Amino acid sequence: MTSPFDINRPGGVGGDPVALLLPLTGRASVLGQALLDAAQMALFEIGDEGFTFLVYDTQGTAAGAEDAARLAISDGAAFILGPLFGQSAQAVKPIAATVGVNVVSFSNNDAVSGEGVNVFGLLPDEQIHRIIAHAAAERHSRIGLLAPVGIYGDRVTDAAIVAAQQAGLEITKVGRYELGEDLSDTIRVFAEYNSRRSSLAYQRKQLAGRSDEIAKQTMRRLEGLETLGDPPYDALLVPEGGAAIRNIAPLLAFYDIDPKRVQLLGTAAWDDDASLGDEPALVGARYAAPSPILRHGFDQRFKQFFKYAPPRLASLAYDATLLAVSLRTAGETADFSAEALADAAGFAGVDGIFRFLANGQNQRGLAILEVRESGPEVLVAAPESFAGL
């Protein structure tokens, strides 16, 4: 290992070691190593000399995860953290279930949850419900949605429709786009730019032949406008981050969607990019994600330990390690049962509070963040307990 400490220690927790399944080789090896580093840092900071962590390479494939799980079980693992990908978690499920070993996967694909597999990734449905509830609290009533074509886009569209209904709002327009395509035509149609521009031209034509004061005042008001009227939504949800939101945001401004009249909304997919405020069209946009307050300290400590900045997902491995250590009774025996994992009071980590549900999905306390030029700022604090949630 290249880390400053070894997580494979002698002893163990009641003779029940915890297996960590990560892609340490293959296409996701850099991310896998970062998650391993985060897990090591958690153990180092806790200072628990009696904890045994067994590390296995999944090679970033379902077949590799299956082999790793079999080896972990044969080595006596009583609890599995990982694997990272949904297909890998699906491959591990029957192997772990056969011997009654529970799994906490770092995937956010809730389709693989259940039957002993708990997904620990940030679930988009919950984020969408949180940000749409915030939009309702801010007195928005009509939501537009831009989502990619595909399974993820279908899922977030369905989630947004349900969330809007529950919040008493209406999804008034849905736009879908192909990943990697030129988005100009899609955004122009979604913004109803042509019809709004035609409305402006028609209004100017109607006023051109009039000389009364009201007509003159109206013409002055229309000066400098590109379109007339607003699009059919007062908030716009774009549940995709990375290059997609950076490509979409300036096009929204180009096609005259005024951020002062249409609130831009997002999800934790935006949380990978702390420099979103560099894009002027995104300043003032809001999204639902774990509070960054505790994670900021984690990021600093990680960088001090390992001399590189952690990827966003690294905190999942850190918190999962804290979870594994916490699942012990006062008698130092491990309780990795489904009942212990489903503790209604939940757990806490650098990404805030979380708990697992009976179906293997997770629930988190999410904050509302606002994009600023200096970086994201907490607008609405994340809950500190699940009381009332």
Predicted feature descriptions by range:
Residues 1-389:
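Extracytosolic ligand-binding ectodomains
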